[in-house]
Amino acid sequence: MTLAEIKVGQDAVLRTIGGQGELRHHLLDMGLTPGTEVTLRKVAPMGDPIEVELRGYELTLRLADAAKIEVDNVHETDRAARSETRHAPVPHPGVGELRKAASYHDRKAGREIAKGQPLRFALAGNQNCGKTTLFNQLTGSNQHVGNFPGVTVDRKDGTIRGHAEATVTDLPGIYSLSPYSSEEIVTRDFLLNTHPDGIINIVDATNIERNLYLTMQLMELGIPMVLALNMMDEVRANGGTIMVNELEELLGVPVVPISAAKNEGIDELVEHALHVARHREVPGRIDFCDATDGKDGAVHRCIHAVAHLIEDHAQRAGLPLRFAATKLVEGDQLIEAALQLDENETELLGHTIAELENETGLDREAALADMRFTFIERLCDKTVVRPGESREHKRSVAMDKVLTGKYTALPCFIGIMALVFWLTFGVIGAALSDLLTLGIDAVTNAADHALTAYGINPVVHSLVIDGIFAGVGSVLSFLPVIVTLFFFLSILEDTGYMARVAFVMDQLLRRVGLSGRSFVPMLIGFGCSVPAIMATRTLSSDRDRKMTILLTPFMSCSAKLPIYALFTTAFFPRQWRAVVMVGLYLTGIVCGILYALVLKLTRYKGEPVPFVMELPNYRFPSARSVGQLIWEKAKDFLQKAFTIIFVATVLIWFLQTFDTRLNVAAPDTSLLALIGSWVAPIFKPLGFGDWRVSTALITGFTAKESVVSTLTVLLGGDTAALSTMFTPFTAVVFLVFTLLYTPCVAAVAAAKRELGSAKAAAGVVVMQCGIAWVVAFVVHCIGTLLGFV
């Protein structure tokens, strides 16, 4: 019987883990080892993927992958009752409790690092364990935090507050040191090549069993290390505890209970980190095998034999011996290549591995994973007291019955997103935008009167009022709309709902050749294409990553909101504006789906990446996190308004004001009219062949908001004059074109970086412009046939 065949609510014991390659290794790293008990919790609304519970957390995987996992001892679940019996009243160790002397440490050879000398720390941990929150507390930084696996996709550096000599690098979250995706490679390469003075390993205390799997591998690196037990406040609130002193004695590293969200225990954590780094105190334990146990004893003998075999090679390659030995036993090809074993050594290694597999009855990868999780289980039995079920988990189960239910998931998603758009474009955002517009108009009028009274040169007066105030002011007026949208999206991400959306949408996206994990980068694309393109690094498949990058521009980014808001306000009554907005977003999604089908059948044939993802519990959104994201987006928008858009506005004003001989000219004889007239014929079949429109579209390549500022400048600040250039129907055609045409320069640069080719990035520009023209032309033709003009 396979895991795919058991029913919701049933327990089963894993017997064999089938499959091969990176996926199988990743499943083992996530705790799917032979002998592990799992519970099938739910099936996605479309029948695939499934969610299983194991080792205290929830994991998603597809039925096709579950069908490769054999199980036995299938029975109705009794996990909740069994967990309740483990609770015992144990005093909670207080934050800042004094420990025993750190005599269990090993001191590295060489002098201690004197106070004031530079120190570099790596902040490492699983995805979604609070790592970025801790980084912000340590450094005072404002990196984005979310309740979704894989928020950090690149390393970030900062200085520890109060310790100018100490820098810390926030590394992307990983589950093991056997890289499964590109962001995990960033973490592994940093640890192996940069050789930090210390590691701060953050562990989710509510999910300690899975988190310690990475801890064991970090300890094998032989780098001074301190373990930060995060979310201890949640553990205590639910009636559980972790016996910190016993845990650090058994592990051989300092263990500090903290709450990164509440800033508890951070000072003590910093003190321990500085101490172990300065005194070069490496973990006192790197051997986790029980030599007297059958399977563990075989693993123990194998690792020691391999370590003896490769000792000289590891030293030449600059690799920690224990780490290199365990990775070589696992079959890590990168480590094998770095060690450069000769033919005889390779043959001897093969014999040693074969002996391990014969004695344990497991393959090399499963044997190592089983050894680690066996040690963790014994460790947790001695140090962890779990409550029956946390309040967060109970709440998540209850909410998921509706939000991921078979018949309610999609209606809930559509309803939530419709509510967000209605509040953003029809109520809150629109009202605040109107108020800000009144304020900008008042400032503009005051400046106009002051310049007139001063008798300033008419050309300078035109530059300030018709150029800068009209262009930049028109873009600034849409700031409330963008802030409101990000407010709601940040709440949805912070709660953990976005991870559920990926779970619900996986089957749908698979039909167009993608994984549910691709949904999140594309959803980020509704905010900005640049971080969305960077977020594709969380996808382990090169095929999926490239496809997602190519599809991200179809998701309408927030930079286009000022264009939509300007045209919907000018041509549609208030009650229809949200409808038009939703229609535009849906058009982008539909076009993206159709393009994905084309890619799937042509350039990117093959299967999408497996959908293996941890589902976090729902959490109440952090006011600080939400406010931080809003501030970052508002700051980015303001910086763009007063840099790129400011320069574009001044340039447009200059080209509109002067002719080829630099004489002040009428707009229709200006340099801008000349340039626009060269491009205008391209757009004439679409119904907007005016040179001013084509000029605005050209400037939109620098930043989409420039379309609004350009049109405002060309219309002399009177946006009501748009009605002389467009009808409501041609306005819709124009909006469709701006929805789909080329991403901005920053997004193209991000695509070039991630695709690794300027040619590929140029292809994105040409492709988007071509698709935009064709779709807009089709809309124009259909509308004309229906009698619209």
PLM regions: where:
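Conserved G1/Walker A P-loop phosphate-binding module
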Residues: 94-176, 194
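Extended, low-charge hydrophobic alpha-helical regions
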Residues: 359, 363-370, 386, 427-468, ...
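Hydrophobic core segments of alpha-helical transmembrane domains in multi-pass membrane transport
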Residues: 412-423, 485-490, 568-571, 584-598, ...
